[in-house]
Swiss-Prot record:
Keyword Manganese: no
Gene Ontology biological process terms, A to Z: bidirectional double-stranded viral DNA replication; DNA replication
Gene behind this protein: 56
Protein name: DNA primase
Source organism (scientific name): Saimiriine herpesvirus 2 (strain 11) (SaHV-2)
InterPro entries, sorted: HSV_PRIM
Subunit structure: Associates with the helicase and the primase-associated factor to form the helicase-primase factor.
GO cellular component: host cell nucleus
Length: 835
């Protein structure tokens, strides 16, 4: 292309042909005679050019444009203006046979050589000059034509363009011009919306257009073609403004998000709510009016949409997702003061007195008690055993446990695995304190209790056992689980921690830092219930032991912990003095609050980011009736009887120099059970029966409140609007219409079973159809074995315009019908109050 040609104005033309465009393009390139015509459908020459010659770039829509050009060049025509004007503005087509006079074949080679290089790879081809593409196209014509179909969106009908860009002249013209001829990253819907803001008039309808020639005639002669430059300018201004507003919203959201510790779910809800506040329907309509073509130049320079973010919502987010303000602002509890609340009887550890049995033995024991004490009437299962364990002689003259123990007192219930059998155990007097004093060796150093916490932990030695004992009595000394008993007050908070991790080697200092952080969080949360001395209050940590890695070498120094997926701890701490929890609900609520406190602690999240992917590290399921948890210093028994995961003491009492009392208390069974009675006698105990997070799930509830509200109860809506029962309404209004469809689409054999039916309301929006002349047969198949298990019913669905869509459904239990899978057959739409 010489310098003179470079100076000619260039215009893009979206063209069509009166035949197969791929074949016609190939004919033109190969010089094959053709009678085809080329039509201008759309172009970006908005006024008559004044130059003598111009360059027309003939284009076709890209089949898969992605983020690239929406139309791709096919030919460049160097053509006289007097020939181009009728083609562009007066629907006069160009003959395909004449195009070779105007085509820039150098540009054509540049366009099509990459295609030819690909399809001719490793294929024999004519030995011609590299610049001669005509011979290659002739040689590989079929593949070349197929490649054009994959590259360009080729269609003989303009229907796809009309349905895509609009069925009226003005929005179609403006939307299509900007979409095809301008550089942008917009969806068609966005451009269509911009066209409606630019021009309210719609122009003529395009519904009746059937050919590209007709469509090109409308676009080329449209009076609105000359407004395209103004529309393009408006689009660029509007999109720049939208980008400014969007960036301001993102900045506002990200600024607040950076201050909050949000789970993935909460983050999604927060972003949704924030965008909803800025871009809900009302605000979007106002903003669209503010930025239409008449007002766009008068919009304030400052951002508009970001100002819609609700300050109260921001305040709620900042306080709810901040640890200190969360605990002070949103946590409440209800309590009463009760005298003489007691838990388990203190264990003097002088003798081992217990009863043990399997489920059948539990049943027999409780049956005997119900027989001898009929007024007690307890269930003869585990729940009954828990009820029995919670009864003492305070309010009963009789000793209900007289067939087991000499005296009646409140006792713990344990579970023990022995010889692949589960035993339920009630213990009146325990000896675990004595057992642990012999099986656990304190550090050998003089004044060991003055050492650092980690040094004491490293020097405490357990006499470990790896296989189950020979007797149940001995097995109870090394493995048992305490059942949570909701009939007894809770004196000690027992926590089961499963902390998900992504590393496999942990030094003792890392674990200690974790324990110190958890201790601080637990005590800070406990202060909600009563006064706690942060320095001296005992919080016991028992870490589940982990095995050495399989590839460990003997001469390699061992790390303290090799846990891979999660760290397991049992954490136990007494409640504040004079405070008890009643039942499982306040315990569950408290632990849920503790979980949330952990999830918004930045220090802990920095150490263990996987916390955000769960509901929290503390298991709340262990506090339900019938659930149990392994007590400290004991083993888990696996299916083969092997003992594993011993819960060893991990000392964490950082603010007291002398750890003796702390360590000794951690081996006292009276300090380690849910319902162990506090030895300090308090006349009036503060009994907490309800703990609540007043703003729990507020972000989820707020998000749900913004979703479109629909009335899902169709039956209730129908009955209230029609003043009829649902069965009468179906029989009078809906069934006659549906029955006409049934007669139209089902065979007479199937239809006959619907002549005599009645209706019955079922659950949800389901109406059962009951045959009065026998059972229904399958509506899909004629089974060889006539099944009597066919269910026919109607499903009701409300529509926004006060109508109901009734769908005839069936279920057949035959295997050929996918064994009871629901099948929809036909639907009819019925107004609620109009026949």
């Amino acid at each position: 292309m010489n310098e003179a040609t470079e100076a000619w104005p260039k215009f893009k033309v979206l063209f069509a042909t009166d035949g197969d465009s791929a074949e016609i393009i190939t004919d033109i390139l190969t010089g094959t005679d053709t009678n085809a015509f080329i039509y201008s459908v759309l172009h970006n020459c908005y006024i008559y050019p004044t130059e003598v010659k111009i360059v027309l770039i003939l284009c076709l829509p890209a089949k898969k444009p992605g983020g690239g050009d929406k139309c791709l060049e096919v030919f460049q025509l160097h053509i006289d203006t007097e020939l181009a004007i009728p083609f562009l503005f007066y629907t006069k087509p160009l003959k395909a046979n004449d195009l070779h006079k105007y085509i820039d074949f150098k540009a054509a080679r540049k366009n099509f050589k990459p295609i030819l290089d690909i399809i001719s790879t490793n294929k024999p081809s004519p030995k011609t000059h590299n610049s001669d593409i005509k011979s290659k196209i002739v040689w590989f014509r079929a593949k070349f034509v197929n490649s054009l179909r994959k590259l360009y969106k080729i269609s003989s009908s303009p229907y796809w363009m009309i349905t895509t860009f609009g069925s009226f002249e003005v929005p179609f013209l403006l939307t299509a011009i900007f979409y095809f001829f301008e550089q942008h990253n917009c969806t068609i819907n966005t451009i269509f919306h911009l066209s409606s803001l630019f021009e309210k008039k719609l122009g003529t309808s395009l519904i009746a257009i059937t050919t590209f020639e007709e469509l090109g005639g409308v676009c080329s002669t449209s009076d609105y073609l000359k407004t395209a430059p103004a529309f393009i300018n408006y689009c660029h201004i509007k999109l720049a403004r939208d980008s400014l507003e969007s960036q301001a919203i993102d900045t506002s959201i990200d600024t607040l998000r950076g201050q909050l510790m949000l789970s993935n779910q909460d983050l999604v809800h927060y972003i949704y709510l924030s965008f909803f506040q800025c871009l809900n329907k009302d605000i979007f309509i106002k903003y669209s009016h503010l930025t239409n073509s008449d007002n766009i130049h008068f919009v304030p320079e400052t951002e508009v949409l970001a100002q819609s973010l609700d300050e109260n919502f921001r305040k709620d987010m900042l306080t709810y997702y901040n640890k200190s303000t969360y605990l002070k602002t949103y946590i409440t509890h209800k309590c009463i003061h009760l005298p003489d609340l007691i838990g388990y009887a203190p264990q003097d550890c002088t003798s081992f007195v217990y009863w043990a049995g399997q489920s059948k033995n539990v049943h027999n024991l409780l049956n005997v008690i119900n027989t001898t004490h009929p007024h007690i009437n307890i269930s003869e299962d585990l729940n009954g055993l828990l009820d029995l364990a919670a009864i003492d002689s305070t309010f009963n003259v009789d000793n209900l446990k007289d067939c087991v123990f000499n005296e009646s007192q409140k006792v713990p219930v344990y579970r023990c695995e022995f010889l692949n059998k589960t035993y339920f155990v009630i213990v009146q007097n325990d000896i675990l304190k004595n057992v642990w004093s012999t099986d656990v060796l304190m550090p050998m150093q003089e004044n060991w209790y003055m050492l650092k916490d980690t040094e004491i932990t490293s020097n405490i030695s357990y006499k470990e056992t790896f296989t189950s004992m020979l007797t149940l009595r001995d097995q109870l000394k090394i493995s048992r689980h305490e059942y949570f008993n909701p009939r007894l007050p809770v004196f000690n908070l027992v926590l089961d921690l499963d902390l998900h991790i992504h590393t496999s080697e942990h030094e003792i200092d890392e674990i200690y830092n974790l324990c110190c952080t958890l201790r601080s969080l637990i005590l800070e949360t406990l202060q909600l219930l009563g006064p706690v001395d942060i320095d001296t209050h005992h919080v016991y940590f028992f870490k589940s032991t982990c095995e050495k890695p399989e590839n460990w070498i003997d001469n390699k120094e061992l790390k303290f912990c090799y846990c891979t997926k999660k760290l397991g701890f049992r954490i136990i701490t007494p409640l504040p003095a004079g405070v008890v929890l009643l039942g499982s609900n306040p315990v569950i609520s408290f632990v849920n609050i503790l979980n949330r406190t952990i999830k918004i602690d930045k220090k802990l999240l920095a150490m263990y980011p996987l916390i955000m992917e769960t509901d929290g590290p503390f298991d709340v399921g262990i506090y339900h009736k019938g659930r149990c948890v392994r007590i400290p210093h004991t083993y888990k028994v696996n299916s083969s009887g092997r003992l594993e995961r011993l819960l060893k003491l991990f000392v964490c009492h950082p603010h007291v120099d002398n750890k003796l009392q702390y360590v000794m208390d951690s081996f006292d069974i009276n300090n380690l059970l849910y319902h162990s009675h506090n030895p300090e006698k308090v006349k009036q105990l503060k009994a907490v029966y309800d703990i609540a997070d007043t703003n729990e799930n507020f972000i989820l509830q707020k998000a749900q409140a913004q979703l479109p509200q629909t009335n899902h109860n169709a039956v209730e809506r129908i009955e209230s609007a029609s003043h009829m029962s649902i069965t009468d309404w179906v029989a009078e209004f809906a069934w006659p219409r549906l029955f006409e469809l049934i007669k139209l689409y089902l065979s007479e054999e199937k239809v006959s079973q619907f002549y005599h039916v009645s209706f019955a309301a079922s659950t949800g929006n389901i109406i059962k159809i009951i045959s009065l002349s026998g059972n229904f047969s399958c509506l899909n198949f004629k089974h060889r074995l006539k099944t009597q298990s066919v269910r026919i019913f109607l499903s009701l669905h409300l529509t926004p315009d006060n109508c109901v869509t009734l769908t005839l459904m069936s279920q057949c239990f035959a295997s050929k019908c996918n064994s009871n899978k629901c099948i929809a057959h036909m639907s009819v739409r019925v107004p609620i109050t109009d026949k």
